[in-house]
Amino acid sequence: MKIGFLTDVDGYRAPIHPESIEKYSLDIHLEKNIFDYLNYADSSLDNVKTISKLSDLDIVACVENIQDKTIKELKEGAVLIGIFDFDKIEEIKSLRPDLKVLSFFKLPRISRAQNLDALSSQANLLGYASVLRAAKETSDVVPMMTTAAGNIHPMFIWRKIYLII
């Protein structure tokens, strides 16, 4: 069984981490330069092949932004795994009814499946990233500083985020 992993269209996320690949002895195929955003060379992974044809893969994992052209190239009856909202699932099914589409959004939000909960993990990352982005955009000081000369009060992050959005 051949498992393929595709980069996100924006190139900043991948559906698998390099450390996870080395744990399992599976027939894994990666899209070329999938880990560029991590500054991790594909050649440093042992026993991993580059995807030559999408139609050879039995299972394909992506993050969320998969193009129609890519969907059309998939093998008949292949399994497509990703973070798809319900509209995207219907769009994929109308384009290719033979595909089995699995979305992390359809997983139950219970404590046993917490490590698979895409909503919580993505929202958590988004909150963290928005604070960093606000800090980058402002001229204020982020942390509170107490020095011999006095105190520097921290910025109000929520005001800055509101202004950016």
Spans of features found by a protein language model:
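Rossmann-like dinucleotide/phosphate-binding beta-alpha-beta segment
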Residues: 155-165
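An N-terminal-biased, well-structured beta-alpha scaffold segment characteristic
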Residues: 1-96
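Glycine/serine-rich phosphate-binding loop and adjoining beta1-alpha1 elements at the start
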Residues: 2, 68-154
